[in-house]
Structures are given as structure tokens and as C-alpha cells.
């Protein structure tokens, strides 16, 4: 099946909301219990409109125009979190000293292990390099750590994101030198 990578646009937001919910519920249950998943869906996980406005969010769609994955990179300080996440820092980064942020990767459970996440990650890494960034950083879910490790990212630290429902979500801060694999 033909897959197309393109920049996300504001009209994609309703579709992305459904994709994110489906991806999280379908893929993260092995790594998180229901309470943190629900809390994260109400606060951390979600569409980041700033990524779309900045032109740094991508979607992959099938031949019938169904969006099956999304992900992006950011030139802003926010490490993770959608529009509802209160710990956002939208100040711009300095490419000479800061790491670009890899952000908001979600793949539909029926479309995993087909190279789609790799396709988006490669586009993000190339775009960040073109913008002058030599390092990349992310807040990965426990579910995503094996994928990112295989792509050359190394673990820096574990973070507990406090959620509105009183739960916490384990997030792993990872980094890579851009162009290193």
C-alpha cells in the first residue's frame, strides 16, 4: 500500500485526536496501567497545535487518505505534551547550543512495524539538521524507548510527569547527536 508523508495542517486536528487516543490505548497498555494512561490522555498526550503552526509536525496517510501516524520535531523548549499540558515552554531554542525536540509520535496499532515511525523520524532528523540543530532530544514513553534506542538515541534520565488525576507517567529523556545513526 502506498504511504505518503506530509506536513500536518490544522484540518488534521480532529483526526489526530482520534489517532492519539487509539495509539495510546492500543500500544501502551503493556507498559502503563490504566490510570496513568487515562490521566495522560487528559493532559500530556494530545495534539500540539504549535508543532502544526511551526510546520514541524508530519502525518503519514494511506492511499485512501487515512492518517495512520503522526510525529514531529520542535525548535521550542517544550520536551513533551500537547495543547492541554501545563508544563509547556514555547520559547525558541538556539540551534548552536540546544537540542531540537523530537515530539508527538503516535502510530495506529494496525500500522506498527511497517517502517512508518522510521519514516517520520528520518524526516524530523533531516529537517532539524537543516535548521542547524546538531543534537536531538525527546521525552519517550516506555513503549517508545526500544524503537528510539534502535535509532541511536541514548537514555539520559527518567522523569515522572505528574498528571491531573493524581497519577504519574514515566517518561524517559533520550538524546542523540544528529546524523549519528
Task: Describe the function of each predicted region.
Residues 134, 138-145, 151, 157, ...:
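C-terminal "cap" of GNAT-fold acetyltransferases
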Residues 21-46:
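Conserved GNAT-fold acetyl-CoA-binding loop/helix
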Residues 1-14, 179-181:
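Conserved N-terminal entry element of GNAT/NAT acetyltransferase domains
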Residues 16, 48:
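Hydrophobic pocket/interface hotspot
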Residues 115-117:
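Conserved G/P- and acidic residue-centered "switch" motifs that form tight phosphate/ATP-binding loops
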Residues 57-62:
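Cytosolic beta-strand hydrophobic patch enriched in CBS
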Residues 54, 66-112, 122, 127, ...:
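Conserved acyl-donor/pantetheine-binding loop and adjacent beta-alpha core of acyl/acetyltransferases
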Amino acid at each position: 500500500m502506498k504511504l505518503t508523508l506530509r506536513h500536518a495542517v490544522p484540518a488534521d486536528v480532529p483526526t489526530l485526536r482520534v489517532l492519539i487516543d487509539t495509539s495510546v490505548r492500543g500500544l501502551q497498555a503493556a507498559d502503563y496501567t490504566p490510570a496513568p494512561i487515562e490521566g495522560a490522555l487528559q493532559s500530556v498526550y494530545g495534539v500540539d497545535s504549535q508543532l502544526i503552526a511551526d510546520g514541524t509536525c508530519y502525518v503519514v496517510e494511506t492511499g485512501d487518505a487515512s492518517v495512520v501516524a503522526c510525529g514531529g520535531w520542535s525548535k521550542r523548549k517544550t520536551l513533551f505534551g500537547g495543547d492541554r499540558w501545563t508544563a509547556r515552554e514555547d520559547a525558541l531554542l538556539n540551534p548552536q547550543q540546544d537540542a531540537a525536540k523530537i515530539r508527538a509520535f503516535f502510530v495506529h496499532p494496525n500500522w506498527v512495524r511497517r517502517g512508518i515511525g522510521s519514516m517520520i523520524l528520518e524526516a524530523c532528523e533531516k529537517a532539524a539538521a537543516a535548521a542547524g540543530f546538531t543534537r536531538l532530544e525527546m521525552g519517550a514513553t516506555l513503549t517508545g524507548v526500544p524503537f528510539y534506542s534502535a535509532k541511536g538515541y541514548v537514555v539520559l534520565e527518567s522523569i515522572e510527569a505528574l498528571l491531573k488525576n493524581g497519577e504519574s507517567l514515566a517518561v524517559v529523556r533520550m538524546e542523540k547527536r544528529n546524523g549519528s545513526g
